[in-house]
Amino acid sequence: MIKIKHLLNEIIENNSIQSVVDRVYPQIVKDLGGQMKPVEVHENIWKQVDAVGIEDLKREQGNPEARYNPHNGVIYLYSEKTNTEEDIIRSLLHEHTHTLQDQKEFKKLYDQGFNYGNHPFEEEAKRAEENWEKYKIK
């Protein structure tokens, strides 16, 4: 019974997240340029990839809010961390910015020693998040 309740809560939560995505993502694309990408909602990255030892992985490797996969062109939002209107909008702005960036250069800069905290493309994506209030429900 608990498992069913958890699953129902997850479905409701994911539907709420999807409704924010449906409302704001087209405007984000219009404002920033580029093309709309598919957006998928999962509880967390580790469940998405069917990992074993999820709690250990979260502690050791983190638990991101969202990510963009340039190989399949999908933006992933993780409901465990991205579940408020602000979180969703910020994540969409951040990840859509990555869809506009040169992915070979993105990887090259990481290979050269940049990390999440100082990578120029991450800094650009973080700056894009600052405009999140433009998209919130008034």
Placement of each model-derived feature along the sequence:
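Short, solvent-exposed loop/turn segments at secondary-structure junctions
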Residues: 46-47, 82-83, 106, 133
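A metal-dependent hydrolase signature that marks the N-terminal structural subdomain at the beginning
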Residues: 1-60, 73
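Acidic-residue sensor for enzyme active/binding pockets
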Residues: 10-13, 95, 122-124, 129
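Short alpha-helical catalytic segment bearing the HExxH-like zincin motif
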Residues: 76, 87-96
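Active-site scaffold of zinc-dependent metalloenzymes
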Residues: 52-86, 103
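Post-HEXXH active-site segment of zinc metalloproteases
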Residues: 86-90, 102-131
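Long, well-structured alpha-helical subdomains associated
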Residues: 131-138
